[in-house]
């Protein structure tokens, strides 16, 4: 896995192949196939691992926060700081690689898991449609992620996105 991640970050995700990963890892291609059926399998596994790490990071940030609005605010800020400081680069690099529908479903579940730590704070705030709120939060943070990765001022993006989401959640909790 480390070999594939290094290749993706150093040479680009398009260079992640059975041959390059096996060579970098010091394995024969036959040995590689004992672990993964294809290069897209290793790409999907790398993305899933990255998202699981990201999710654990976010869960840790909000674990002991008792104020639900503060938990949401910290989650948004932390998720975008993670992007701004470059820890999201591997997932970004790998996202351009074509993967199977099953692999996409696994990655989609990992993305949704990242948002789960917000379910309880949203419920505590009286948000009725938690799924809608999570979808809106995801959309806003994804937009900010794209802007940060395109060179926008990360401090401003984080602050504006956090304020936008907190205000939006406040509105949802009143409706």
State the predicted function of each range:
Residues 3-41, 45:
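Helix-turn-helix
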Residues 45, 59-85, 137:
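Hydrophobic alpha-helical connector segments
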Residues 61, 77-84, 93-98, 164-169:
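Helix-loop "lid/cap" segments that line or gate small-molecule binding pockets
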Residues 91-95, 104, 108, 122-166, ...:
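Hydrophobic/aromatic-rich alpha-helical bundle segments in the mid-to-C-terminal region
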Residues 3-8, 50, 79, 141:
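Short hydrophobic clusters on alpha-helical segments that form packing/core surfaces
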Residues 8, 36, 41-50, 93, ...:
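Alpha-helical DNA-contacting segments of helix-turn-helix folds
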Residues 52-55, 74, 82-85, 100-135, ...:
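Amphipathic alpha-helical packing segments from all-alpha helical-bundle domains
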């Amino acid at each position: 896995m480390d070999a594939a991640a290094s290749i993706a970050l150093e040479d680009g995700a398009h260079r992640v192949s059975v041959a390059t990963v096996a060579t970098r890892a010091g394995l024969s291609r036959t040995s590689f196939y004992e672990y993964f059926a294809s290069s897209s399998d290793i790409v999907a596994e790398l993305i899933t691992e990255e998202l699981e790490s990201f999710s654990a990071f976010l869960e840790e940030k909000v674990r002991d926060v008792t104020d639900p609005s503060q938990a949401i605010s910290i989650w948004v800020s932390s998720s975008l700081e993670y992007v701004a400081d470059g820890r999201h680069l591997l997932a970004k690099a790998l996202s351009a690689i074509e993967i199977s529908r099953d692999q996409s479903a696994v990655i989609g579940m990992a993305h949704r898991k990242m948002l789960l730590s917000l379910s309880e704070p949203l419920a505590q705030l009286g948000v009725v449609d938690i799924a809608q709120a999570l979808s809106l939060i995801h959309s806003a943070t994804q937009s900010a992620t794209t802007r940060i990765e395109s060179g926008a001022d990360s401090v401003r993006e984080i602050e504006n996105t956090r304020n936008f989401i907190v205000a939006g959640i406040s509105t949802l909790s009143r409706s």
